[in-house]
Curated annotation (Swiss-Prot):
Pfam families: Rota_NS53. Plays a role in the inhibition of host innate immunity by inducing the degradation of key host factors required to activate interferon production such as IRF3, IRF5 or IRF7. Associates with components of cullin RING ligases (CRLs) including CUL1 or CUL3, which are essential multisubunit ubiquitination complexes, to modulate their activities. Recognizes the host NF-kappa-B regulator BTRC through the presence of a DSGXS motif in the C-terminal substrate recognition domain. Belongs to the rotavirus NSP1 family. The C-terminal region is phosphorylated by host CKII/CSNK2A1. Phosphorylation of the DSGXS motif is essential for host NF-kappa-B inhibition. The integrity of the zinc-binding domain in NSP1 is important for degradation of host IRF3. The pLxIS motif targets host IRF3 for degradation; however phosphorylation of NSP1 pLxIS motif is not required for its activity. A motif (pLxIS motif) lies at residues 480-483. Residues 82-176 are annotated as: Important for cytoskeleton localization. This is Non-structural protein 1. Residues 317-486 are annotated as: Interaction with host IRF3. Residues 1-81 are annotated as: RNA-binding. One of its GO terms (cellular component) is host cytoskeleton. Residues 42-79 are annotated as: Zinc-binding domain. It is found in: Host cytoplasm, Host cytoskeleton.
């Protein structure tokens, strides 16, 4: 049973304010929706179910019923989900405003309780106070939230989430903010509400309250590519692909954490709802998460034997070689930038190997191959540098004055020559480990400069940020022939 969903359904009928603010897609007529993929809690109705992706941020956080309203916790329209969403530093006053909003939308008094009990008893065999008939009265006010960090901004989506031990495949984690407020004050609020309930329901209310107000915070999760719509992931190989998102907007002039105060002034709240509209944005996929996804896909297709081969062609253009031919049927190769990086990295590595080690054919089995598997995964800095260090050590470097050197006197292509000139100022004949790391980073950074990339895509930006970028024409950062550096 989804307690929050039931509470919205029943309390929606008590006045005009609630009829507008407590409207949920899950309580309305179902409409066709995108297929579900992950298990977790819908941020809109707070029930644990199968989730589909949100049209506002492309992350999986909405159920197939609520998706029809297209609400996102990053919206600018003061719908219930947005008013329950807080950002970054949350103060005691902010939490007091949230509790006041709950008290306004979900009041508990003798009149309300009698009204709901009388409504339930109109049905046959409902003279007893059983929890399934009064689930909407058993929603305590808690400071339980699902939290996520997006590029330095931390969001808290408050609500009443049942069954906290259920499987959670979303990037949101449970955070309890009761210590910022005051446990005793929150206890007093709930004990007062509980006093209006029949004795047979009070125990269930108390159990729910304490279980949701005394839990230990979960460890914050890291957002990764699997948390975004499969439609986006399937098109990452296209350099000019743009993500289409929609956001619900209004003339919301409050600070982010003060949206919940709107329900105190009903006329002003309805005036603001009149300004509600939908804004459409086309944004770039450029970010560390998606870049790492593409580089990992290419890493799985690496043929390390090429670095000991004598092929005259580029690494991705070798055909009819059992050890070096790359399977070009994978969509990751449709991105010419990935091909360029792969070709130049392996052209440079082959020159290093041929300059220092006497290996004559690509069919030979060498220890160096096992370290080549990670040369593209530059986003995992520690693992990547360890891989380069092991490759360097396999080249039998010569040590002089505590510095190790390797030779570099084999032919390379013009692209690699240009990288050498730009990164270290010349085409050298000896290289240190630091030189090798710098050169290989430069080959990748020419197309994917992760040093200046945000971690998550622009779909996780707030409306204010999107509007500023849209004004500067920066929401679509793509061009089929221009690199990051250019």
């Amino acid at each position: 049973m989804a307690t929050f969903k039931d509470a919205c359904y029943h309390y929606k009928r008590i006045n005009k304010l609630n009829n507008n603010s407590l409207k949920l897609g899950v309580n309305d007529t179902w409409r066709p929706s995108p297929p579900t993929k992950y298990k977790g809690w819908c941020l809109d109705c707070c029930q644990h179910t199968d989730l589909t992706y949100c049209s506002g941020c492309t992350m999986y956080h909405v159920c197939q019923w609520c998706s029809q309203y297209g609400r996102c916790f990053l919206d600018n329209e003061p719908h219930l989900l947005r008013m329950r969403t807080f950002k970054n530093e949350v103060t005691k006053d902010d939490l007091k405003n949230l509790i006041d909003m709950y008290e306004t939308l979900f009041p508990m008094n003798h009149k309300i309780v009698c009204r709901f009990i009388n409504t339930a008893r109109q049905h046959k065999c409902r003279n007893e106070c059983m929890t399934q008939w009064y689930n909407h009265l058993l929603m305590p006010i808690t400071l339980q939230s699902l939290s996520i960090e997006l590029d330095g901004d931390v969001y808290y989506v408050f609500g009443y989430y049942d069954n906290m031990n259920n499987i959670n495949q979303t990037p949101f984690s449970f955070i309890n903010l009761v210590d910022i407020y005051d446990k005793l004050l929150l206890d007093d609020v709930n004990f007062t509400r509980m006093s209006f309930l029949p004795a047979s329901l009070q125990q269930e209310y108390a159990l729910r309250y304490f279980s949701k107000s005394r839990f230990i915070n979960e460890q914050r999760k890291c957002v990764n590519d699997s948390h975004f719509s499969i439609n986006v992931l399937e098109n990452l190989h296209n350099p000019s692909f743009k993500i289409q998102i929609t956001r619900n907007c209004s003339e919301l002039s409050f600070d982010w954490n003060e949206a919940c105060k709107l329900v105190k002034n009903v006329s002003a709240y309805f005036d603001m709802l009149k300004t509600s509209h939908i804004e459409f944005y086309s944004v770039s996929t450029r970010c560390r998460i998606f870049t790492q996804c593409k580089l990992k896909m290419a890493s799985k297709l690496i043929k390390p034997n090429y670095i000991t081969s004598n092929h005259k062609t580029l690494a991705t253009e070798v055909h009819n070689c059992k050890w070096c031919s790359v399977n070009n049927s994978y969509t990751v190769w449709n991105d010419f930038r990935i091909k360029k990086i792969y070709d130049n990295i392996f052209n440079f590595l082959r020159a290093l190997v041929k300059s220092n080690v006497n290996i004559g054919h690509c069919s030979s089995q060498e220890k160096i191959y096992e370290y080549v598997k990670d040369v593209l995964n530059v986003c995992d800095d520690e693992r990547w540098k360890t891989s380069i260090m092991e490759i360097f050590n396999c080249l039998e470097p010569v040590e002089l004055d505590d510095v190790k050197y390797v030779l570099f006197n084999h032919e390379i292509n013009w692209d690699v020559i240009n990288v050498l000139v730009h990164s270290i100022g010349k085409v050298p004949q000896i290289l240190t480990l630091e030189n090798v790391i710098t050169i290989m980073q430069s080959i990748i950074y020419e197309w994917f400069d992760i040093r200046y990339m945000r971690n998550t895509p622009m779909v996780t930006f707030t409306i204010d940020k999107l509007r500023r970028l849209y004004t500067g024409l920066k929401t679509v950062e793509y061009d089929s022939g221009i690199s990051d550096i250019e």
